[in-house]
């Protein structure tokens, strides 16, 4: 009789060891940066997207950017004047909560601030995000942007999408070869995909994507920075919850 898979014992020692080694490496890498860089920024990210963060790393390739556990990051910098790894560095600890990261740099702080002020990327919203505006699809023939641009500058929705639109809850139908809400003359109710301020589910985000409507904006917020020369921390935003999720461990 073959051995039951349920009876199989999985050894988790190796996984635990790997995680511990990653944390130790992150801790050491942060501490190694402290004497080699003039400034350390704490930042948070709205609507995290790995591909956009890679662009940031490429642009700031002479800096070091860390994403890691906030408690570990705080310990690496020091949380009190007694254990701070440099004068005043412990003052950054109050900004290390939620989904935040560190940027070590020798660039002038004004250059870093200017770069991030001008950095925004729009993207499709994900489930769990909050709608930034109300999206209403007008009745009548459907167009690819759902009324976001005038019909004369848009193209009709492909008939192949009609079954999926219906499956996602839109009361669509085919009228003379066109995908319509109501009838071709526009008689019928408009369809509200989402209302401003509501939390989006996967059905709503799929509909938004089908109509090429972007409600998400990738943005980096600089919260504060420490300067080695003065030992002072300059606040750029009031400390608070930068995000509910812990940061991923990444020290590249």
Curated annotation (Swiss-Prot):
Its main location: nucleus. It comes from the Eukaryota. Keywords: Cytoplasm, Nucleus, Ribosome biogenesis. One of its GO terms (cellular component) is cytoplasm. It is found in: Nucleus, Nucleolus; Cytoplasm. One of its GO terms (biological process) is rRNA processing. SUPFAM superfamilies: Ribosomal protein L10-like. InterPro entries: Mrt4, Ribosomal_uL10, Ribosomal_uL10-like_insert, Ribosomal_uL10-like_insert_sf, Ribosomal_uL10-like_sf, Ribosome_Assembly_uL10. PANTHER family: MRNA TURNOVER PROTEIN 4 HOMOLOG, MRNA TURNOVER PROTEIN 4 MRTO4. Belongs to the universal ribosomal protein uL10 family. Component of the ribosome assembly machinery. Nuclear paralog of the ribosomal protein P0, it binds pre-60S subunits at an early stage of assembly in the nucleolus, and is replaced by P0 in cytoplasmic pre-60S subunits and mature 80S ribosomes. Associates with the pre-60S ribosomal particle. This is Ribosome assembly factor mrt4. It comes from Neurospora crassa (strain ATCC 24698 / 74-OR23-1A / CBS 708.71 / DSM 1257 / FGSC 987). The lineage of its organism: Eukaryota, Fungi, Dikarya, Ascomycota, Pezizomycotina.
